[in-house]
Amino acid sequence: MPAPGIFHVCWDGKVPLTYRPHNNGEHHDPTKNQTGSRLVYWRCDSRKRCWRGDYHDQGANHWIDDHIATPMSKYRDYEQSRQSFGINVLGTLIVEVEAENGQTGFAVSTAGEMGCFIVEKHLNRFIEGKCVSDIKLIHDQMLNATLYYSGSGGLVMNTISCVDLALWDLFGKVVGLPVYKLLGGAVRDEIQFYATGARPDLAKEMGFIGGKMPTHWGPHDGDAGIRKDAVMVADMREKCGEDFWLMLDCWMSQDVNYATKLAHACAPYNLKWIEECLPPQQYEGYRELKRNAPVGMMVTSGEHHGTLQSFRTLSETGIDIMQPDVGWCGGLTTLVEIAAIAKSRGQLVVPHGSSVYSHHAVITFTNTPFSEFLMTSPDCSTMRPQFDPILLNEPVPVNGRIHKSVLDKPGFGVELNRDCNLKRPYSH
């Protein structure tokens, strides 16, 4: 069992900290190393914004907060900005785990101070003292121990995901292998990406295979809203040409009737797919939308589904692509299981963003022919790592691609930026 530790922590209402048990100085066979939990609440003080663990927490004039349709858009007070209803309040959670030999693994998600509390006061008991390879055991214990308050995902699952990813990172570093090799190795030489952002035309110039735009209108806007978003797609089709993929991200903001009308309004412009039109649990709605969507247009969802069971039910609706976020769905351990469910039904699994935490998974999946890159620059004109500045050495696509050799570093191949202000609101 690791010796008692010291925590360095930081909290401003939205950022993460670091807990680090002392190394007891002993040396062990790496395969027998035990892990001590390390929780990181990282934050940047109010005078210097250092966001991006929570990529929604951006500054003014950023495309990601510019009149994007949401479930709250029907309330005029919260229509213009997603930050107005609090999309950025959770903040960043960083979890670190340390083996007895002093090696550490870490991961990033969104759960903020509340996630820190869950790890420190509850989940730590399932981590400390375990072998670094006991990832599935720890994962199962965390899931079952939180059933009585986790519901169908959300904050608790974000936290569990972060712990799981940190454990995979540590395991890879202990054995000296990239995570994708721990999963069985790459099935292709490179990952090709589409870009999510407001400017698919710029994404095309950067070498991406497609561009996914947010919708700006919803059912409360009636047919006028449908026409406005269809005009946006038509305009981008003219700019990008016929062969470039165009997709729409509806972010849970629609109902079946509106989504069906929007899909048909965009069909003349060769829309490749329409994404997450409905709230997560409206499975019958997704089934109906898929049944009535234009021929050749895919229906996709999954970003805000939080359990393996919810993905199994979603798969049964017949949608074309499932899109879990590895930082929210239960971690890499669950993502692998989701990919297997999708594969058994002939469906694709294309995770939502998540940078290296997705890269190491999707390059091993035979049913992930492409992946998502989230444009985090304010106007989508430059390439910026999703988790900058928290992660160091975070790769970005070159000409829309990342070669597997870029991932050939132990663990997830990134380091925690210790220049970010690290604090801890809780101890155990």
From Swiss-Prot:
Substrate binds at H56, R82, E372. Keywords: Lyase, Magnesium, Metal-binding. GO terms for biological process: amino acid catabolic process; carbohydrate catabolic process. Its cofactor is Mg(2+). GO terms for molecular function: L-rhamnonate dehydratase activity; magnesium ion binding. The record marks E372 as: Transition state stabilizer. Binds 1 Mg(2+) ion per subunit. Mg(2+) binds at D249, E275, E303. SMART domains: MR_MLE (SM00922). Its EC number is 4.2.1.90. It is an enzyme of class 4 (lyase). Pfam families: MR_MLE_C, MR_MLE_N. SUPFAM superfamilies: Enolase C-terminal domain-like, Enolase N-terminal domain-like. CDD domains: MR_like_2. PANTHER family: ENOLASE SUPERFAMILY, MANDELATE RACEMASE, MITOCHONDRIAL ENOLASE SUPERFAMILY MEMBER 1. HAMAP family: Rhamnon_dehydrat (MF_01288). Homooctamer; tetramer of dimers. Catalyzes the dehydration of L-rhamnonate to 2-keto-3-deoxy-L-rhamnonate (KDR). Belongs to the mandelate racemase/muconate lactonizing enzyme family. RhamD subfamily. Reaction proceeds via a syn dehydration. This is L-rhamnonate dehydratase. The lineage of its organism: Bacteria, Pseudomonadati, Pseudomonadota, Gammaproteobacteria, Enterobacterales. The gene is rhmD.
